[in-house]
Amino acid sequence: YKEWNVGFFNAIPEDLVSDNIDLSNITWLRRDSKFHCYADPFILNVSDYTIDLLVEDILLGSKNVATICHLSVDKCTGEIIEKYTLIDDNIHNSYPLIIRGDTLDEVYIVPENSYSTELNVYKYNTLLHSCEHFSTMLPVAVAATILPYNGAFYLFATSRNAYNKDLYMWTSNNRLYGYDLSPILIKSNLFGSRMAGDFMHVNNTVYRPAQDCLQGYGKGIILYKVEDIS
């Protein structure tokens, strides 16, 4: 089985877009079980001593079953301090995109589930560490990621039939629902189509992280500068 893990390193946003990254001193997540590995991290919160993440929790040897978990991790050691299972429906869930509401405790999760027929939104109760279904955003879409831009919301995702290759864009006037059902094909290539994380804002410029899948899923990450959306 392929084994994935999460690593932490110190950098500022400008380092990430200038290729000035020092990967010589990575703190790796200390897995709590040899049967579990973690992938697709999205940062929920950072304090002086801990990092809170939403991640894909993969149960090795389980015929592609994965859950969405909240991990609280020691920043210095990579040790998991707390773990909460949020979405577990006995199929493969991954890529837990975080959407923040108007208050600090208003959090929504949009996980990828390419085995489902829908892209669903869950409201996360951060006090009780529980999720409830909030809405259905679209028919199934892979690695859905949303960019607010000039008063509208643009959702980028690949299709289930070409999940590493065909990147589409949907639009809406609301971040959580109302996306049009006739997406625009943006890119069709194994290089740089599938999303690799949330959009980055650095010095008033927006960047789109994407995967290099020419040699297989997750073989590399590319950054694209977003110049305009129309």
Residue ranges of model-derived segments:
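Carbohydrate-active catalytic/glycan-binding domains of CAZyme proteins
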Residues: 1-230
